[in-house]
Design a protein with these regions (language model features):
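Hydrophobic secretory-pathway targeting helix
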Residues: 1-34
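Sequence/structural segment immediately N-terminal to covalent heme-attachment motifs in c-type
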Residues: 38-56, 143-164
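Extracytoplasmic electron-transfer domains, predominantly the class I c-type cytochrome c fold
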Residues: 72-130, 172-225
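Intrinsic disorder/low-complexity detector
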Residues: 28-40, 125-147
């Protein structure tokens, strides 16, 4: 009995140690020993040097190795130059968790945001200082029209993101859902074209039209399912499969019923 109790106690201790060790695993983010006393520019420079420079270069010139290694989205090099991308691109990739990448070969994908809002603002300011570029947009969906946004979204976006912004797969690339993106992140994505998404300039989609597109996306985040069940909200594919399933069950039941009656006759 005493040995059993000792074994159980030892197991609990080891489990506790393992739990603590797991909780203290580093996230892989390099931070200054103390962020206090650092100006925003200094903090951004140190965070950039520790987490971004390996792929994007010390001065944002990008990394283009002689062997022409290509990264995610077939981008030449480990990381593209950041000179001239402005605060817009940095804010988008950091607030969505697209960056930093654990592997330059993988497709950027929304994941847990690794930096605090203060750190994101610092890195964004530092990247913006590398060269003149676009600032963070300030969209106003309330000034847009949902009906106009629906037509614009159908024309420019639904081919990849589906009619109600549920995302999908296009040319071996996952297309993200838009329902968890903020208005600012949507506006940023439209202007920079992350991964395989095309870039839409203000000549292609004006700020006024962009407000309407965002207003439509906001409206489909909580759709009114008049039929009672949205079936995924991704269009005719699940609806057709559900219809065929119901029809197949009904036909089999009808065949069984007819067979039973013919057997009795």
């Amino acid at each position: 009995m005493r040995r059993a109790r000792t074994f159980v106690a030892l197991a609990l201790v080891l489990l506790g140690v393992a739990t603590v060790a797991h909780a203290e695993l580093p996230s892989g983010i390099s931070r200054p020993d103390s962020e206090r006393g650092l100006s925003q520019q200094e903090l951004g420079a140190q965070l950039y040097a520790g987490n971004c420079a390996t792929c994007h270069g010390i001065a944002g010139e990008g990394v283009l190795p002689p062997n022409r290694t290509r990264g995610a989205g077939n981008v030449r090099g480990l990381g593209p130059p950041l000179k001239g991308v402005g605060a817009l691109a940095a804010d988008f990739y950091l607030t969505t968790g697209f960056m930093p990448l654990q592997d330059p070969q993988q497709q950027p994908w929304r994941r847990r945001v690794e930096f605090t809002p203060k750190e994101i603002a610092a890195i964004t300011q530092y990247v913006a200082s590398l060269g003149p570029g676009p600032s963070i947009p300030r969209p106003d969906p309330s000034a847009g029209s949902v009906s106009v946004g629906f037509h614009l979204f159908t024309e420019h976006c639904a081919g990849c993101h589906q009619a109600v912004a549920e995302g999908g797969y296009v040319t071996n690339v996952r297309v993200p859902k838009l329902k968890q993106d903020t208005a600012t992140q949507i506006a940023e994505a439209v202007r920079i074209g992350p991964n395989l998404m095309p870039v839409f300039s203000k000549h292609d989609i004006s700020d006024r039209q962009l407000n309407s597109i965002i207003a439509y996306i906001e409206s489909v985040k909580h759709p009114n399912d008049r039929g009672g069940w949205g079936i995924g909200h991704i269009g005719p594919v699940p609806e057709g499969m559900f219809t065929w399933l119901v029809a197949a069950v009904a036909l089999v039941a009808l065949c069984v019923l007819i067979g039973e009656r013919l057997g009795k006759a």
